[in-house]
């Protein structure tokens, strides 16, 4: 028996060296030739037209539990029973038990070749050899992942200051007296004109004039015009009287006039004739103090946001108001401000994994929906993540031999053909299951449900958060449905539809809600978002009224499944696959070899 064991090992090594590389290359070439044929040929295939005697519901359908079934149901039990009791099983068992034993001769040529391979193993597959060299090769592969996240939204309030006056007003009388002959006069168009600048502003409540008789003995009549009022003057007579002026008011700094002719007959005046004018003016007396009034403009409820920045938009300094001819001035350090509020904080959402991975880079992003004010609230982001594959090869002359199972991946790249094919088949199977369950005229597949969450006026109570639920105390106010929706979002079962104001008072929004379409599986979410919306451009409705209807059969046939990205489904697929443990396989091979050696020694 000890002599036979090296022979068996030599046999295995010889066969592995001689055939592994050629068989592997042949299989790899064949796989690349038929790549993609399965998924393209299955689309639009009608089995009843191509398969004679096709039956859509054979008896064997009782063993099929759907793509989500955990096992094969009764198929295993029925198979075991048939093997033990059926004629076919009995025949196979008897043939196996009565089969003559194979006696291996130590002198067989293939055993001798195997021994030779064992003796030269290090030079064949090791890192040594006269004409061979071991090399490391590596390859980078980039995979795109799409995720969703909230963006930070900033809104602004403005505060503007204006200067106003406060105080009281009283009235007093002022008496103004003038002697016209003592004032400078100018000759204008044959008239002597005296201009008098008023020192006050007010209403003339009494006007009085007077003059004395002159030295002239003859009568010299003329007209003196004062404040627009004509007065009759004569050199032979004196006068002392009141009059009602045409001009009723005086303005500080503004002149009024008195005038008469330069020559009357043969008499020529050298200046304005003597005349006293007395005016009693009612003047307003005010006592004012300047102060500042602030006005604010805010298109949203400040309770919905957090103040992050305040900046001055109109520089400070002195400003002046003039009232009743009097100037009032005051100083302000800033006359207008702009306050910045964050009304929505950024949330990494389902992008957390990729933003934390240094091998992932943001390649594109697109706004999913906007606020009523036009700000982007939510976006779809695409990250490209790099993964490196390395392997060890032996280069002998012009031939390259793979020393481990990774070198072909490093040379040609890892392929997701299997995962992609299984995902497409699973999507079609799931759609078929939905259709079969309805049996109606208006058949739909992958139907979802409209879900809502609220963003309360308290600011910190955001029940629409995509992450950080365990650390936010404000989330205690969220309902169980909102918490379930958050779980569905983390499992990538939702499609974001929009956001709207659900409670508004006096034009200010106090509460907002966000709407989603929630589906039962990742496959449904992928087909709905990428197929229905992405390819067919069918909307999910408005924020207030989401349209989460299923996909019709006609729409399903128009979707190109080979263009759908099933990356999110791959994770579940790979996590749920059952691959035998390598240690178990090794032990099983050892047991089989031991059994063969025992039989050979008998």
UniProtKB/Swiss-Prot annotation:
- Major subcellular location class: membrane
Q: What happens when the gene is disrupted?
A: Greatly decreased conjugtive transfer.
- Per UniProt, which keywords does this protein have? Cell outer membrane, Conjugation, Disulfide bond, Membrane, Plasmid, Signal
Q: Which GO terms describe its cellular component?
A: cell outer membrane
Query: How this protein is processed and modified after translation, per its record?
Result: Has higher gel mobility under non-reducing conditions, suggesting it has disulfide bonds; a dsbA deletion mutant has considerably less TraN that is still localized in the outer membrane.
Q: List the disulfide bonds.
A: none
Q: Which Pfam families match?
A: F_T4SS_TraN
Record's subcellular location? Cell outer membrane
What is said about its interaction partners and assembly? Interacts with OmpA of recipient cells. Might form multimers. May interact with TraG.
NCBIfam families tied to this protein? PRK12355.1-4, TraN_Ftype
The free-text domain note is: The first 350 residues are required for recognition of OmpA.
Per the entry, what this protein does is: Essential for F plasmid conjugative transfer. May interact with the recipient cell surface to stabilize mating pairs initiated by F-pili. May interact with TraG. Transfer requires OmpA and lipopolysaccharide (LPS), which are possibly receptors for TraN.
The protein depicted here goes by the name Mating pair stabilization protein TraN
Organism listed in the record: Escherichia coli (strain K12)
The organism's lineage is:
Bacteria, Pseudomonadati, Pseudomonadota, Gammaproteobacteria, Enterobacterales
């Amino acid at each position: 028996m000890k002599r036979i064991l090296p022979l068996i090992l030599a046999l295995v090594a010889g066969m592995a060296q001689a055939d592994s590389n050629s068989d592997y290359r042949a299989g790899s070439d064949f796989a690349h030739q038929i790549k993609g044929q399965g998924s393209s040929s299955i689309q639009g295939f009608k089995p009843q037209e191509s398969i004679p005697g096709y039956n859509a519901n054979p008896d064997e359908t009782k063993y099929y539990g759907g793509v989500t079934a955990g096992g094969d149901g009764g198929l295993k039990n029925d198979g075991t029973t048939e093997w033990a009791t059926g004629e076919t099983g009995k025949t196979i068992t008897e043939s196996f038990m009565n089969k003559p034993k194979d006696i291996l001769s130590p002198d067989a040529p293939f055993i001798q070749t195997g021994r030779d391979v064992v003796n030269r193993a290090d030079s064949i597959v090791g890192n040594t050899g006269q004409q061979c060299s071991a090399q490391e090769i590596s390859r980078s592969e980039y995979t795109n992942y799409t995720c969703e996240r909230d963006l930070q939204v900033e809104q602004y309030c403005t505060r503007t200051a204006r200067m106003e006056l406060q105080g009281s007003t009283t009235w007093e009388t002022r008496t103004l007296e003038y002697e016209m002959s003592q004032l400078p006069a100018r000759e204008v168009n044959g008239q002597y004109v005296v201009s008098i600048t008023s020192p006050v502003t007010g209403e003339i409540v009494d006007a009085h004039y007077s003059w004395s008789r002159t030295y002239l003995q003859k009568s010299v009549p003329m007209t003196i015009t004062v404040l627009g009022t004509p007065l009759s003057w004569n050199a032979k007579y004196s006068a002392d009287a009141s009059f009602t002026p045409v001009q009723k008011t005086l303005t500080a700094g503004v002149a009024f006039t008195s005038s008469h002719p330069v020559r009357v007959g043969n008499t020529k005046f050298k200046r304005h004739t003597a005349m006293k004018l007395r005016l009693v003016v009612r003047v307003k007396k005010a006592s004012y103090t300047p102060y500042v009034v602030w006005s604010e403009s805010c298109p949203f409820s400040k309770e919905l946001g957090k103040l992050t920045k305040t900046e001055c938009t109109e520089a400070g300094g002195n400003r002046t108001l003039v009232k009743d001819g009097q100037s009032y001035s005051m100083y302000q350090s800033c006359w207008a401000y702009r306050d910045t509020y964050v009304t929505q904080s950024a949330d990494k959402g389902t992008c957390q994994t990729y933003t934390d991975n240094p091998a992932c880079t943001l390649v594109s992003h697109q706004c999913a929906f906007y606020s009523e004010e036009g700000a982007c609230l939510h976006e779809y982001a695409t990250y490209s993540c790099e993964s490196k594959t390395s392997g060890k090869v032996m280069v002998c002359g012009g031939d390259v031999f793979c020393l481990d199972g990774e070198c072909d991946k490093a040379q040609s790249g890892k392929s997701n053909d299997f995962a992609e094919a299984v995902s497409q088949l699973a999507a079609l199977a799931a759609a078929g299951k939905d259709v079969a369950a309805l049996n109606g005229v208006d058949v739909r597949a992958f139907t979802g449900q409209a879900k809502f969450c609220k963003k309360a006026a308290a600011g910190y109570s955001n029940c629409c958060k995509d992450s950080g639920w365990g650390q936010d105390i404000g989330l205690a106010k969220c309902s169980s449905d909102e918490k379930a929706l958050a779980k569905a979002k983390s499992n990538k079962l939702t499609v974001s539809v929009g956001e709207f104001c659900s409670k508004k008072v006096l034009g200010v929004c106090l509460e907002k809600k966000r709407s989603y379409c929630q589906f039962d599986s990742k496959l449904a979410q992928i087909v709905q978002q990428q197929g229905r919306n992405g390819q067919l451009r069918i909307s999910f409705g408005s924020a207030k009224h989401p349209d989460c209807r299923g996909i019709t059969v006609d729409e399903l046939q128009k979707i190109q499944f080979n263009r759908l990205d099933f990356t999110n489904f791959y994770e579940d697929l790979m996590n749920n696959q059952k691959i035998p443990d390598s240690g178990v396989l090794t032990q099983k091979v050892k047991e089989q070899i031991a059994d063969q050696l025992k039989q050979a020694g008998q």
